[in-house]
């Protein structure tokens, strides 16, 4: 089986202009694999990367989202819309998935806002329980226009994908707690581009460029790595249908590929002197593949090929990571 060439990853350092954006380049890929990988990673990144999200909120003195908030510029609906933009991190070493699955809403760890107006409420005014963190501290939430106390409790948990309002409403049955829809995905944007690149005179490959942006709770490179891990976990049982397949070597190192390509080129491309070139041609040697089947002593016996020409040929082979057979 002809092996696939191992590709290289170019993951740049954090972008100083936008710390939540990452551009990753993957190359060289065989023709067709740019779209295969780019599209598969895209679907997983946008739908299945785990994260944290608000799923309910409680406003002190208010029972539903369609009420105006006295003394606050925004009504409750608009405040909820702003709160849904919170980039929340939850430490899964403290709060596992099972922890939330078995927890009643009245025992839930809550993020709280206790704000004395007037003034502007931002995410930095949120007090988080241990294990919870708000990444986008500058997020605008509301403007309090009067000297009143604003009390808000925010309920969040880990998950993946999107969960609609009705599903969360079934879970939240406590009076005065308002269910919201949830978007757990930390990936805000994913785009990819595939370009053809020339490896040699006759060989083409692809370069896959992924442009990904997150909400800051994880990096773009982390999101891509998690997506690859999810894909790997789904493919592994299929690979294990035949246990012998696990022992197959699918990829080869770049150096091996270069040697393979160099071993099949014409001696016309070695840029030899006329004397050395003519001597090889007259002896029926036309490619490097034929040349490296010779030992040094066999090469020295070729008619009209002197010691200087032999040294020249060996040097040209070395430049292409090739060598003669051992005597």
From Swiss-Prot:
Keywords: DNA-directed RNA polymerase, Nucleotidyltransferase, Transcription, Transferase. Residues 1-242 are annotated as: Alpha N-terminal domain (alpha-NTD). SMART domains: RPOLD. One of its GO terms (cellular component) is DNA-directed RNA polymerase complex. The keyword Transcription applies. Its EC number is 2.7.7.6. It catalyses: RNA(n) + a ribonucleoside 5'-triphosphate = RNA(n+1) + diphosphate. Residues 259-327 are annotated as: Alpha C-terminal domain (alpha-CTD). GO terms for molecular function: DNA binding; DNA-directed RNA polymerase activity; protein dimerization activity. The keyword Chaperone does not apply. It is an enzyme of class 2 (transferase). InterPro entries: DNA-dir_RNA_pol_insert, DNA-dir_RNA_pol_RpoA/D/Rpb3, DNA-dir_RpoA, RBP11-like, RNAP_asu_C, RNApol_insert_sf. Gene3D superfamilies: 5' to 3' exonuclease, C-terminal subdomain (1.10.150.20), DNA-directed RNA polymerase, insert domain (2.170.120.12), RNA polymerase, RBP11-like subunit (3.30.1360.10). One of its GO terms (biological process) is DNA-templated transcription. The N-terminal domain is essential for RNAP assembly and basal transcription, whereas the C-terminal domain is involved in interaction with transcriptional regulators and with upstream promoter elements. Belongs to the RNA polymerase alpha chain family. Homodimer. The RNAP catalytic core consists of 2 alpha, 1 beta, 1 beta' and 1 omega subunit. When a sigma factor is associated with the core the holoenzyme is formed, which can initiate transcription. DNA-dependent RNA polymerase catalyzes the transcription of DNA into RNA using the four ribonucleoside triphosphates as substrates. This is DNA-directed RNA polymerase subunit alpha. The lineage of its organism: Bacteria, Bacillati, Mycoplasmatota, Mycoplasmoidales, Mycoplasmoidaceae. The gene is rpoA.
